[in-house]
Amino acid sequence: MKVLLLGGTRDAINIAHSLLALNESGGQRIALIYSIAGIVRQPTINCAIHTGGFSQFSTGTASNPSQQGMKQFIQHNNIDKVVDATHPYAITISTNASTVCERLDIPFLKYVRPPWLVTDKDHWINVNNWAEAKKAMHPFKRPFVTIGRIANQDINAIPEHQFWTLRSAIEESQIQDQYSLIKAVGPFAEEQEIKLLQTHHIDVVVCKNSGGSAVDGKLSAARKLNLPVIMLNRPETDRAYGNHYDNEHDLIRAIR
């Protein structure tokens, strides 16, 4: 059986190792292709690795090159099943994969990482999109923004009364005096996050509900420092796919 695993997360790495371990148990052999955008870091997995997305395989003038390229890739590599373990906010790749699998009549299995849940010790301000997040940020002066890539136009439009601390990959900006960029890859321990929040005089944390079984360092740090958190809610498509699993063991059993 040939499986295409859409990755780029720690969950995907764990799933890949679990699938490869099945080959040593004497069951059905799995030929795994691990796909990653390749923006941040390359995984160390003993299987074929595809990097750079799928639009490179698109031909002609397709309206959706990524989707057409993925279809070409799946057909060319004789993929039997597609497993999506991308980030919960990676809507485009998940939608493309689900659509392609439906058209090719092959199984599509989606891993949905459990979201973080607010506690009575947290002060979350829930928002549905980036526009709402920016509006919620307005009363604060020193937000810590950890939502991923920030558009150049947003960096150039930081309100005069604010100084942003960013931990993300951003485009170049002509304005350099209203933000500081921290280039680092997690996970981050609570002690690290407390030190960062205090050093940069942060008064609000802005993040996505990426979720996971582990307690997030920045959320526990914000809780201890009594800081509010502007939480960008999960996309509505989070559980819109037919075969979705929030437990890795159930997912592995379904793939087998």
Task: Show where each model-derived region lies.
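Redox-cofactor binding/interface segments in oxidoreductases and associated redox assembly factors
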Residues: 83-84, 145, 207
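Non-catalytic interface/targeting segments
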Residues: 1-36, 106, 110-183, 249-256
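Glycine-rich, highly charged phosphate/nucleotide-binding loops
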Residues: 47-74, 183-192
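Structural motif
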Residues: 78-81, 142, 203-204
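Short acidic-hydrophobic, aromatic-tinged amphipathic segments that line or gate anion-handling sites
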Residues: 49-64, 123-131, 242-251
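Glycine/small-residue-rich loop that forms an oxyanion/phosphate-binding "nest" at active or ligand-binding sites
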Residues: 66-130
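Helix C-cap/helix->beta junction micro-motif
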Residues: 26-28, 77, 104, 225
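A C-terminal functional module that forms or caps the active site or interfaces directly
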Residues: 177-225, 230-234
